[in-house]
Amino acid sequence: MRPRIAHVALYSQLITRPTGRTLRTNILRQIADLDHAVMAVINFRHVPLIDVSCADEIVAELVEWVSEVSPHPRFVWFRGVAEHHLEPIERVLKNRDLVAAAENTDGEPLLMGRYEPVVAQAWREICDMGRAGVPAIAERIPMSLDDTSSLLNAMESLSLLIRDADEYVSLKCAFQDTEVSYPLTPDGQ
């Protein structure tokens, strides 16, 4: 399965709850009713500041949205996450017991929020490989095939991975393999 990519680049200081709510609402308005799998890619590369209230409204709310039951899979991937973004983002995700897939400013994969060490280990392995089946991941973790399958299914339900037939695909790999289908605008225009 290849999701359609909806990409938005943010270019301002994100410092109030109403700003965050407006931005999230505009993003969701543009992709919520799509009748296929979609991955929202939110680029923080040009965001000099994000406070806790905006992190809560944008990051945590979008992560919760992708976790809701939907007829079509939904994913969110945060790119360009810098050190100064991490404290507010980590705080809100941990407070809500959420986890999100991201990429730092150097293009390295990054998990944010609350997760078990085995989730981070499996996630890093899939990010390194791009895509892999259960046996390949089980060998690298190492875990039994059944335990690895259960773990990867749980990670898919958290929208950390995309399932494509018998393989699991990192969000970065899916993004690189798919052209941007829907360039989003922060103002919804």
Positions of predicted regions on the chain:
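Amphipathic alpha-helical interaction surfaces in cytosolic regulatory modules
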Residues: Y11-M39, F44-L98
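Short helix-capping/hinge SLiMs at alpha-helix to coil transitions
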Residues: D33-H36, I126-G130
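Short acidic, hydrophobic short linear motifs in intrinsically disordered regions
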Residues: V41, D128-I141
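Short alpha-helical segments that sit at the start of domains
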Residues: K94-C127, D147-S150
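Short, cationic-aromatic polyanion-contact patches
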Residues: R163-Q189
